[in-house]
Amino acid sequence: MRSIARRTAVGAALLLVMPVAVWISGWRWQPGEQSWLLKAAFWVTETVTQPWGVITHLILFGWFLWCLRFRIKAAFVLFAILAAAILVGQGVKSWIKDKVQEPRPFVIWLEKTHHIPVDEFYTLKRAERGNLVKEQLAEEKNIPQYLRSHWQKETGFAFPSGHTMFAASWALLAVGLLWPRRRTLTIAILLVWATGVMGSRLLLGMHWPRDLVVATLISWALVAVATWLAQRICGPLTPPAEENREIAQREQES
């Protein structure tokens, strides 16, 4: 448990570098970012947004199983644990959002530029909020259509970031489960992807840096427990002797 907690803590620290740096810098979101950067951020965030998030989940689960070489029974147990970790994280996120009720950056911007009081905005039902955003931004040339559509769908509260929790959970699961097998490329790709998802939430006006920080910390706690459970139920996560030889050979060739 301690080794898993240490590994995932290092991964969480790496994920926290970007949002903490942005937080300290005092950066504030404003519409009108470079179009190519904004479009790239949108497509990165779409890898987590439904329905694509389900596809991402299934692809990553399949890859994890291949890397871990689990038997069928153990595979189903691991799938249940991984799915539970993601679902519990999303449930915790929803509960905190309802309690804290922090407005999104773009909602604050709507209040300043379109005179829509934040309190009144959030008293509306979700569908009504989406329609209001659509009406108010119909003539807004500085906001691309894809971003307007995204805002119409994402009219909930900001704190903490659900997209960050999804991506960070997978990245930290990689650190916890795949590091003993030295799947360093997979770990690096997922850490970069998770950081990209976090950055996209800032650029799209969906979250504040603190939303990302807290979401990452929650993900770390959940993943530490999930990997511990996986080890208790499925057995040691360390590779057997035969696989250790293969890992050593792979490292020599790289």
Curated annotation (Swiss-Prot):
Leftover remarks: The enzyme active site contains a catalytic triad that establishes a charge relay system. This catalytic triad is essential for the dephosphorylation of LPA, PA, and sphingosine-1-phosphate, but is not essential in its entirety for the dephosphorylation of PGP, the nucleophilic histidine alone is sufficient to hydrolyze PGP.
Lineage top rank: taxon: Bacteria
This enzyme's EC code(s): 3.1.3.27, 3.6.1.75, 3.1.3.4, 3.6.1.27
InterPro entries per record: P_Acid_Pase_2/haloperoxi_sf (IPR036938), P_Acid_Pase_2/haloperoxidase (IPR000326)
Pathway connected to this protein: Phospholipid metabolism; phosphatidylglycerol biosynthesis; phosphatidylglycerol from CDP-diacylglycerol: step 2/2
Residues at the active site: 163, 207
Region of interest called Phosphatase sequence motif III, as start-end residue ranges on this chain: 200-211
SUPFAM superfamilies in UniProt: Acid phosphatase/Vanadium-dependent haloperoxidase (SSF48317)
Record keywords, A-Z: Cell inner membrane, Cell membrane, Cell outer membrane, Hydrolase, Lipid degradation, Lipid metabolism, Membrane, Phospholipid degradation, Phospholipid metabolism, Transmembrane, Transmembrane helix
One Gene Ontology term, aspect cellular component: plasma membrane
Role description: Catalyzes the dephosphorylation of diacylglycerol diphosphate (DGPP) to phosphatidate (PA) and the subsequent dephosphorylation of PA to diacylglycerol (DAG). Also has undecaprenyl pyrophosphate phosphatase activity, required for the biosynthesis of the lipid carrier undecaprenyl phosphate. Can also use lysophosphatidic acid (LPA) and phosphatidylglycerophosphate as substrates. The pattern of activities varies according to subcellular location, PGP phosphatase activity is higher in the cytoplasmic membrane, whereas PA and LPA phosphatase activities are higher in the outer membrane.
Record site: Stabilizes the active site histidine for nucleophilic attack: 211
TM region positions: 2-24, 55-66, 72-94, 162-176, 183-202, 209-232
Catalyzed reactions per annotation: a 1,2-diacyl-sn-glycero-3-phospho-(1'-sn-glycero-3'-phosphate) + H2O = a 1,2-diacyl-sn-glycero-3-phospho-(1'-sn-glycerol) + phosphate; a 1,2-diacyl-sn-glycerol 3-diphosphate + H2O = a 1,2-diacyl-sn-glycero-3-phosphate + phosphate + H(+); a 1,2-diacyl-sn-glycero-3-phosphate + H2O = a 1,2-diacyl-sn-glycerol + phosphate; di-trans,octa-cis-undecaprenyl diphosphate + H2O = di-trans,octa-cis-undecaprenyl phosphate + phosphate + H(+)
Membrane-side (Cytoplasmic) residue stretches: 67-71, 177-182, 233-254
Protein name: Phosphatidylglycerophosphatase B
Residue segments, region Phosphatase sequence motif II: 160-163
GO MF term list: diacylglycerol diphosphate phosphatase activity; phosphatidate phosphatase activity; phosphatidylglycerophosphatase activity; undecaprenyl-diphosphatase activity
pH dependence: Optimum pH is 6.5 for DGPP phosphatase activity and 6.5-7.5 for undecaprenyl pyrophosphate phosphatase activity.
Entry similarity comment: Belongs to the PA-phosphatase related phosphoesterase family.
EC class: hydrolase
Ranges of the Periplasmic topological domain: 25-54, 95-161, 203-208
One GO BP annotation of this record: peptidoglycan biosynthetic process
